[in-house]
Curated annotation (Swiss-Prot):
Tissue expression notes: Expressed by the venom gland.
Protein name, as recorded: U3-theraphotoxin-Hhn1a 9
Coiled-coil stretches noted in the UniProt entry, renumbered to this chain: none
Lineage: Eukaryota, Metazoa, Ecdysozoa, Arthropoda, Chelicerata
Keyword Cytoplasm assigned: no
Organism of this sequence: Cyriopagopus hainanus
Entry annotated with the keyword Signal: yes
InterPro entries: Huwentoxin-1 (IPR011696), Huwentoxin_CS1 (IPR013140)
Comment on protein domains: The presence of a 'disulfide through disulfide knot' structurally defines this protein as a knottin.
GO molecular function ontology, one term from the record: ion channel inhibitor activity
Subcellular location per the Swiss-Prot or TrEMBL entry: Secreted
Main location: secreted
GO CC aspect terms: extracellular region
Bridged cysteine pairs (disulfide): C54-C67, C61-C72, C66-C79
Leader peptide range in chain numbering: 1-24
């Protein structure tokens, strides 16, 4: 009877551990597209032309406001062209 209790406890603990690992893996996968796109469109400091008071196309808009003609994407936090349904 003791062996059955121990095996049930180990099985339950294994399932909980599997759930935690799968959840952590899934949450990392959700961040992957953002990280990949950020690295693709990242601008090196050597290629920056000048500092502006506003952020241009595909620039981060966390601290700065976007230049005229662009809006800050709520999902990606970049300055993008406004979609027709947002005007």
């Amino acid at each position: 009877m003791v062996d059955m209790k121990a095996s049930m406890f180990l099985t339950f603990a294994g399932l909980v551990l599997l759930f935690v690992v799968c959840y952590a893996s899934e949450s990392e996968e959700k961040e992957f597209p953002k990280e990949m796109l950020s690295s693709i469109f990242a601008v090196d400091n050597d290629f920056k032309q000048e500092e502006r008071d506003c952020a241009g196309y595909m620039r981060e808009c966390k601290e700065k406001l976007c230049c005229s003609g662009y809006v800050c994407s709520s999902r990606w936090k970049w300055c993008v062209l406004p979609a027709p349904w947002r005007r």
